[in-house]
Structure formats: structure tokens, C-alpha cells
Amino acid sequence: CKNSPIKGLTEVPGAIDPSTGTCLTPPRPVLFCTSPDGTQANQTCKDEGPLTLERSTTVDEEISAKVIDFLDRNDPKKTNKPFFVWYNPARMHITTMLSPKYLAMLGEKGGKDWGINEVGMKQMDDNIGLVLAKLEAMGQLDNTIVVFTTDNGAEVITYPDGGVTPFRGGKLTTWEGGMRVPMMARWPGHIPAGTTNDQIFSMLDWLPTLVNIAGGPT
């Protein structure tokens, strides 16, 4: 939604701006939640302020910094325990605003001719690279299973954000276009680089699989 004048309101904040529609709701809060034992009953959440348009330009940098801090505090060399990180960057869920650094890459000369989506992907890649670099600095990169995927098919109602060819349906449907998504996994010594697997896998199985690999109960 694009911030636009609305009768009776002097200011309409928003967190996304694909230049279509009008924001009728305030921006979402950014919550930082912790739990000493991983249970919801003992969870506390801190409101770190609204995800405004301006903040959305660098919110992924905030998220990656928190992930890196978590990794530092949970380094197995310090804790003698495995760690689990569920890292959810804002990219490429929807077209958030670009910071000056990435705005400068739009239409970049030299054959790239990047648009908003390509530049957003670059920002996401950079932040994932920071997390992988932290794992490498910890000496854990080759001892960590890294999975990269998405939660649903493309939201085709907001074309041209994505497509689902050759599948039927899209986000908010239970057709393959809404449920079947690509996935990449990195597990040195177990998954050969460049391997392609066309088998269907339910992401519901990931958590028990990872727990089992880490030595937890089956």
C-alpha cells in the first residue's frame, strides 16, 4: 500500500510501499521476544517501535544483527550445545522501501539493469551473507545445516510480484501453486554441492528431522 492522503487524517504511516492502494492501518510493531526455556508460557516481548516506511529500509539489517548476536551468545564452544536459528528477513515477502545504498543500484550500469525486485534480492543476499560469514568466523559453517526456503507460493493477485508456472493456484490456495515452493539446503559432507532432488517434502518434517540430527529424541 502507498501512503496517500485520506480525508480526515493528517498522517497515515505505513511499512510497505509497492505504490498501489492506500494504507488504512498503522504500521506493525517490531517485537523482540525472549524465553529462558523456549516455552510460550515464559516468553516476554518488548515493543521496539513501529515498522515505519523509513525503518523498513534497514529492518533486515536489524534482524541479521540480532541473529549474529544470538549466534555469538550461543556458540557451541561456549555452551557445549547445538543451536537453532529461524531467520526470517523481510525480503522478499513484499516490496519494502530501499535504503539510499540500494536505491543507488537501481538501473545500475554495466549490464545489470536492476529493478526493485533485483535490488531487494541483493539486499537479502547481503544480509544472509553476513550470517554465513559469522558461522564461518565461529568455525561452525561446515558443521551447520543451512536451509533456505519460503512459506508459500507467489501472491499472484499482486502481479508482477511473482508467478507459479507451471502450477495451479497461488498464495492463499491449497493448489500446488500455493503450497509447493523451492528449497535449498547446505550440509557439507552429507549433501553433495549441486545436487538436485525433485521429491516432495513437507516442511512440517523439518523440525523433528533437525532435532534428530542434533542428537535429540526421535
Q: What residue spans do the PLM features occupy?
A:
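Substrate-binding rim/cap in mid-to-C-terminal beta-strand-loop elements of soluble/periplasmic
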Residues: 2-4, 44, 129-138, 162-218
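Core domains of carbohydrate- and sulfate-ester-processing enzymes
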Residues: 1-45, 94-98, 157-181
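Solvent-exposed loop/turn segments at secondary-structure junctions
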Residues: 90-94, 152-155, 174, 189-191
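Active-site His/acidic residue clusters
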Residues: 47, 67-117, 155, 161-164
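Metal-dependent active-site segment of extracytoplasmic phospho-/sulfohydrolases and closely related
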Residues: 79-82, 86-89, 123-159
